[in-house]
Amino acid sequence: MILVWLFVAAAILFGLLGLSLYMLRPETEKTRSFAAFDHTMIAHRGLFDNHSEAPENSLAAFRKAVDQGFGIELDVQLTKDGKLVVFHDFDLKRMCGIHKKLTELTYAELEQYSLKGSTEKIPLFSAVLDLIAGRTPLVVEIKVGYDYKATTEAAAEML
């Protein structure tokens, strides 16, 4: 009887060991989905200089990043009229010099402001995706000022 219990205990131990090894194995599907990020430097908010014609989170900064082989990290949030735009801050003070929240303005209202005195405007996420055209890895940060669900759904729909 002891021999049977030893056999059962050994079988359970080997089963648990096998299960542990299976659970710790590299996930090839997940590994493949992140392969684009291997050895790719990421340009945070694009390849920008806020004292030039390529301020952060602008089409010019993203164009420079793509042209120089960088991946891109960017921030998206919704305007008052539900347009998904690329912009980091919740207010426009630092980048546009006005005391308003992005979520208080429509996209048409945002178009009248330039980024850091350049000719660049706050871009629509769709315009950035058109510019990038799948040529480089993209890290999208969802900025939520008021509606996480709508912002996330809008970004997911475009991706």
Language-model regions: role of each:
Residues 2-159:
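Phosphate-group recognition and catalysis centered on beta-loop-alpha active-site segments
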